[in-house]
């Protein structure tokens, strides 16, 4: 089971403490931490919000586009991009010259006869999801030139716990239970877990059900209503991806 320190810190304030040391203490006192502790986001820098101001088709390529990007600087930046979802007004993750993605440092690069002074990135390229279908799409309310790490929880510390060591601890099968352990280790207060007033659901219509086989001692049903198909918030998608899961539609 992968665990996110950002998620844990929703429930306990660990500011000012050495998170790596806390994870090591957790491994010794509660459950074995497997493999390496991952510092997510440490491999990228210089990724900012860039707005596409113009789009032209490449004269010699059906796949490439010539873009002008507003990255919050005095002048627009010329970029060559082959993503299928480019359009004027789209804000995206833009790696400026000098930005780093893993072991790659972005430099001016000649592509099909034009110089690209940066790179428009997909979520997969910056390591926050496996979506490489096109460049990342960012909401219009974010200022051009804003560092992506200032608006999204890209920096995180993720560690993996051996499931076998938690078999007899169902209270640790989620981030809140793990946060309780960290609160004890750090001497910090555990924040209450807010729940809806369950009495508000007492009057719900019961599900009609008939058990025909007397050998069936119990059968449970759950009805879920008012589900929407909205895209999950970016930070939630990042957390799920870091923990080895994907945000998928119920359909």
What residue ranges belong to the model's regions?
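Phosphate-backbone binding interfaces of nucleic-acid-interacting proteins
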Residues: 1-203
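Residues forming anionic-ligand binding surfaces in small-molecule and nucleic-acid pockets
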Residues: 148-164, 205-243
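Extended, well-folded interaction surfaces typified by the phenylalanyl-tRNA synthetase beta subunit core
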Residues: 177, 236, 246-248
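Conserved small/polar residues in nucleotide/adenosyl-binding loops
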Residues: 251
């Amino acid at each position: 089971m992968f665990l996110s320190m950002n998620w844990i810190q929703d429930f306990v304030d660990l500011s000012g403490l050495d998170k790596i040391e806390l994870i090591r203490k957790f491994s010794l006192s509660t459950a074995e931490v497997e493999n390496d502790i991952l510092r997510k986001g440490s491999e990228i820098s210089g990724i900012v919000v860039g707005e596409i101001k113009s789009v032209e088709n490449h004269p010699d390529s059906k796949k490439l586009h010539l873009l002008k990007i507003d990255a919050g600087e005095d002048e627009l930046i010329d970029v060559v991009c082959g993503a299928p979802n480019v359009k004027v007004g789209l804000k995206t993750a833009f790696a400026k010259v000098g930005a780093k993605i893993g072991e790659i440092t972005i430099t001016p690069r000649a592509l099909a006869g034009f110089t690209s002074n940066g790179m428009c990135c997909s979520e997969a390229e910056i390591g926050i999801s496996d979506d490489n279908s096109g460049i990342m799409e960012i909401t219009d309310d974010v200022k051009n030139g804003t560092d992506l790490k200032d608006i999204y929880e890209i920096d995180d510390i993720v560690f993996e716990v051996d499931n076998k060591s938690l078999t007899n601890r169902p209270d640790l099968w989620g981030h809140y239970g793990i946060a309780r352990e960290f609160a004890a280790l750090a001497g910090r207060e555990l924040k209450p877990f807010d729940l809806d007033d369950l009495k508000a659901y007492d009057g719900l219509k019961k599900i009609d059900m008939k058990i025909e086989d007397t050998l069936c001692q119990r059968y449970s049903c759950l009805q879920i209503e008012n589900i929407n198909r909205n895209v999950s918030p970016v930070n939630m998608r990042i957390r799920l991806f870091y923990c080895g899961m994907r945000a998928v539609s119920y359909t």
